[in-house]
C-alpha cells in the first residue's frame, strides 16, 4: 500500500506534465487549454476553470485503475486529490504561514509564472520534470532569457520547416 502511494504520486506528476505539454500543442491549446489560460493572474478557482476536453485529459490519469488492481479507498483518495489539488496550485503564493515559526511550501509561484509566460513550468509535483526537460522558470532574469532563447530556437525551426 505504501509503495502504491509513492508510485501514484510519481505517476500523477509524470501524467500531469505530459498532458500539460500536450495541451499546449497549438491545435489543442486553441480548442481547449486557452480557456484555462484566460486566467493570467490565477486564483484558487482558476485551477478547475477548464474546457470539458481539458477535464477529460486531466482526469485520464484514472485510466491506470482500469488496468491495475487498486484498493477502492485508494482510488477515491487519489481522485479527490486530483480534483482538489488545482486550487492551492493557483493561489499565487509560495508559502502559507500558520504562525511565526510554522509555514509550508505550496509551490504555486512556479505555476503563476506559467500563467504569466505560458511556455514554462508545466510540472506540478515532486519530480523536477521542468528542470529535466528544460522548461523551468524560477522567476530570475536568467530563467527568462533561457526561456526566450528556447522559444526563439523553436520558432526558427517552425519557420524553416514552413519555407
Annotated model-derived regions:
Residues 5-16, 77-86:
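Alpha-helical transmembrane segments of multi-pass membrane proteins
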Residues 10-30:
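Transmembrane alpha-helix/helix-exit interface in multi-pass inner-membrane proteins
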Residues 25-163:
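Cytosolic/stromal cytosol-facing helical appendages immediately following the last transmembrane segment
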Amino acid at each position: 500500500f505504501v509503495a502504491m502511494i509513492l508510485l501514484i504520486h510519481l505517476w500523477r506528476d509524470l501524467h500531469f506534465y505530459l498532458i500539460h505539454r500536450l495541451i499546449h500543442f497549438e491545435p489543442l491549446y486553441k480548442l481547449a487549454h486557452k480557456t484555462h489560460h484566460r486566467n493570467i493572474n490565477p486564483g484558487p478557482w482558476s485551477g478547475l476553470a477548464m474546457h470539458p476536453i481539458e477535464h477529460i485529459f486531466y482526469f485520464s490519469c484514472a485510466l491506470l485503475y482500469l488496468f491495475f488492481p487498486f484498493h477502492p479507498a485508494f482510488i477515491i483518495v487519489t481522485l479527490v486529490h486530483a480534483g482538489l489539488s488545482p486550487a492551492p496550485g493557483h493561489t499565487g503564493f509560495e508559502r502559507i504561514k500558520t504562525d511565526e515559526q510554522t509555514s509550508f511550501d505550496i509551490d504555486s509561484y512556479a505555476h503563476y509564472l506559467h500563467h504569466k509566460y505560458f511556455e514554462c513550468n508545466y510540472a506540478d509535483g515532486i519530480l523536477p520534470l521542468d528542470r529535466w526537460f528544460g522548461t523551468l522558470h524560477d522567476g530570475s532574469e536568467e530563467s527568462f532569457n533561457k526561456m526566450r532563447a528556447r522559444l526563439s530556437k523553436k520558432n526558427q525551426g517552425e519557420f524553416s520547416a514552413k519555407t
